[in-house]
């Protein structure tokens, strides 16, 4: 079972549809009282997009601190930023606001979630994890070709992934497959 932590964002329902097609799913908001008990039972956790800063999103960062070495984690947009921040990275304003903008992501290192050397991605964000301040425990696996901002990262040893872009959007043609690969990874690790 995958726990999808909902950060008050409508894109969560697109994620839920993709995940729910391949495995059991529970969706709970980031401030739900049963969050930790359901997380304890899950095979992996996905942290959804959402508004605002990661340190203002309910239990988001506390959950990452609690489960980073116990469960596979995938952070999307706000979730990606929260992972970056929890591991000592800096979240800052992007060079430009990217709401509903398609960019090309260049693969900069091998990833368990995608293999194409480049792919179109849909962006909805004004904050980023600063490239030169990503934790040394992480590898940047994808950057936008237009502004070289971090679009994907993964932990060097643990199954922890961050995607700044929206894989659940129709504007990311290979995004659903990325999400399915994460779900498969959670099933393989248990």
Language-model-derived ranges and their functions:
Residues 112-158:
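Catalytic beta-strand/loop cores that center a nucleophilic Ser/Cys/Thr
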Residues 43-111, 179:
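Cysteine-nucleophile active-site neighborhood
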Residues 24-32:
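A short beta-strand-loop structural module common to alpha/beta enzyme folds
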Residues 2-21:
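Short, charged N-terminal beta->alpha structural module
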Residues 1, 24, 43-44, 72-74, ...:
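Structural signature of beta-strand start/N-cap positions in the alpha/beta core
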Residues 11, 52-54, 170:
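Active-site beta-alpha loop architecture of Rossmann-like, nucleotide-cofactor-dependent enzymes
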Residues 169-190:
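Acyltransferase
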Residues 33-42, 133-136:
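Short amphipathic alpha-helix with an adjacent loop that forms part of the alpha/beta core around
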């Amino acid at each position: 079972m995958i726990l999808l932590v909902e950060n008050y964002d409508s894109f969560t329902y697109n994620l839920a549809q993709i995940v729910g097609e391949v495995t059991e799913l529970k969706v709970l908001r980031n401030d739900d009282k049963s969050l930790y008990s359901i997380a304890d039972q899950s095979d992996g956790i996905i942290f959804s997009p959402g508004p605002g800063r990661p340190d203002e999103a309910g239990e988001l960062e506390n959950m990452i601190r609690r489960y980073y070495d116990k469960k596979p984690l995938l952070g999307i947009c706000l979730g990606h930023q929260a992972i970056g921040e929890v591991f000592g990275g800096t979240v800052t304003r992007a060079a430009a606001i990217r709401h509903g903008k398609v960019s090309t992501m260049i693969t900069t290192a091998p990833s368990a979630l995608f293999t194409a050397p480049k792919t179109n991605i849909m962006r909805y964000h004004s904050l980023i994890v600063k490239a030169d301040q990503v934790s040394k425990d992480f590898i940047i696996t994808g950057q936008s070709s237009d502004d070289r901002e971090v679009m994907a990262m993964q932990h060097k040893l643990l199954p922890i992934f961050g995607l700044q872009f929206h894989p659940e959007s129709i504007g990311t043609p290979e995004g659903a497959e990325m999400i399915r690969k994460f779900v498969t990874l959670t099933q393989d690790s248990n």
